[in-house]
């Protein structure tokens, strides 16, 4: 049953920074990458208007106490994003902070790009700080259910369809290089990529064993035979 509740909360005036965010993105085309992600952020969120966002709770007692108002605690995205700067000395070590901020690059998942390219820069602007120079939103590694599956499915702990890297390493006797090769070969950074163990083994055998492996073996054999190994 749906129960409506009312709760006192502090809000961050996100809407106040919509124009500044639009100008920043326009003047810094490298800020959001890949470029099509920038279009998503602008067209799906900025153009529709930003709503002020709740940043505190008063009905729970876990979280970071709000300064001067201990009845409220800060939670979720607002405090999580601040970790980027408090972890490098903001407010406690100016020399350390100036060494590392503004940062060159955030790499985040596409599902949290909105918070890192619209909310986080607005928070920094409110604090008089410069946003990161670039935020790159990478895609997901989707699990193929079969060889004919061209769309894949997002991995989920609740569904139990996750790939466990340590177990996968045992397939190659602990060597991660075949897995790295597959990911670099098959997946376009920034886009979603499809994974299956069958596809991994097929690529391993066709490229690394039959292709590069055979070429290396033949080349080394000829060097040894005709050039005395030099």
State where each predicted segment sits.
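Structured secondary-structure scaffolds
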Residues: 2-228
């Amino acid at each position: 049953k749906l129960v409506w509740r009312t709760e006192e909360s502090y809000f961050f005036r996100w809407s106040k920074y919509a124009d500044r965010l639009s100008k920043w993105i326009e003047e810094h085309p490298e800020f959001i990458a890949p470029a099509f992600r920038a279009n998503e952020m602008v067209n799906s969120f900025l153009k529709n208007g930003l709503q002020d966002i709740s940043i505190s709770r008063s009905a729970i007692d876990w979280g970071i106490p709000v300064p001067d108002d201990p009845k409220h605690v800060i939670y979720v995205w607002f405090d999580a994003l601040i970790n980027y700067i408090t972890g490098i000395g903001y407010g406690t070590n100016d020399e350390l902070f100036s060494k590392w901020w503004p940062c060159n690059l955030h790499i985040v998942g596409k599902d949290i790009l909105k918070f890192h390219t619209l909310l986080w820069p607005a928070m920094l602007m409110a604090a008089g700080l410069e946003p990161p120079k670039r935020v790159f939103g990478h895609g997901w590694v989707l699990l193929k259910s079969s060889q004919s599956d061209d769309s894949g499915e997002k991995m989920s702990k609740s569904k139990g369809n996750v790939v466990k890297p340590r177990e996968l390493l045992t397939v190659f006797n602990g060597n991660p290089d075949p897995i790295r090769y597959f990911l670099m070969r098959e997946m376009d950074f920034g886009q979603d990529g499809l994974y299956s163990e069958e596809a991994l083994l097929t690529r391993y055998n066709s490229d690394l064993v039959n292709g590069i492996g055979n070429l290396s073996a033949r080349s080394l054999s000829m060097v040894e035979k005709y050039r005395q190994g030099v």
